[in-house]
UniProtKB/Swiss-Prot annotation:
This is Large ribosomal subunit protein uL16x. Keywords: Ribonucleoprotein, Ribosomal protein. It comes from the Eukaryota. Signal peptide: none annotated. Belongs to the universal ribosomal protein uL16 family. CDD domains: Ribosomal_L16_L10e. GO terms for cellular component: cytoplasm; cytosolic large ribosomal subunit; cytosolic ribosome; mitochondrion; nucleus; plant-type vacuole; ribosome; vacuole. The lineage of its organism: Eukaryota, Viridiplantae, Streptophyta, Embryophyta, Tracheophyta. GO terms for biological process: developmental process; response to UV-B; translation. Component of the small ribosomal subunit. Mature ribosomes consist of a small (40S) and a large (60S) subunit. The 40S subunit contains about 33 different proteins and 1 molecule of RNA (18S). The 60S subunit contains about 49 different proteins and 3 molecules of RNA (25S, 5.8S and 5S). InterPro entries: Ribosomal_uL16, Ribosomal_uL16_CS_euk_arc, Ribosomal_uL16_dom, Ribosomal_uL16_euk_arch, Ribosomal_uL16_sf. One of its GO terms (molecular function) is mRNA binding.
Amino acid sequence: MGRRPARCYRQIKGKPYPKSRYCRGVPDPKIRIYDVGMKRKGVDEFPFCVHLVSWEKENVSSEALEAARIACNKYMVKSAGKDAFHLRIRVHPFHVLRINKMLSCAGADRLQTGMRGAFGKALGTCARVAIGQVLLSVRCKDNHGVHAQEALRRAKFKFPGRQKIIVSRKWGFTKFNRAEYTKLRAMKRIVPDGVNAKFLSNHGPLANRQPGSAFISATSE
């Protein structure tokens, strides 16, 4: 018996049903890699960021997420190069899908109980997505922004429903606008922290210290 089509599970119904000690025997999700490309590049390297945003409330299967990741990664490697981007999958397939297998042969009513005890067994996993939720994000240099948008456009065909490609006003994966990030970086109020950035606050007794040394202990001064 083949895999049931994902259109049967597209609508969100009922409560979330995650894997637990009560829900056993769940197949592993098809997607196992959520960060692709130069994921160790610093926050200053890739200022451009673009998102693929869901425009419907629906379930997205792990197979669709893996297909979108492969399509986006393949185009970016071919057009921009494998060292020129960082792709991140922003949703995780934690919701377990169930199936109540039914026989369709002659005399099936003698072998099964029909809809009695029809809770079903685990079939696969999916991600429950809301309207406006980000599915995929790509950060890169400004000159590869066109390639990133085209890569997400190709990945969009792997998902059901409607999605939008939105160019972010933020600097990379951070929460700071580009102009704000540049200004705070020049003032040394922002410290790079991997793919993100840490803001050095000026509240409290630390306000009298020099910018960039807010977390230095008093013993080292």
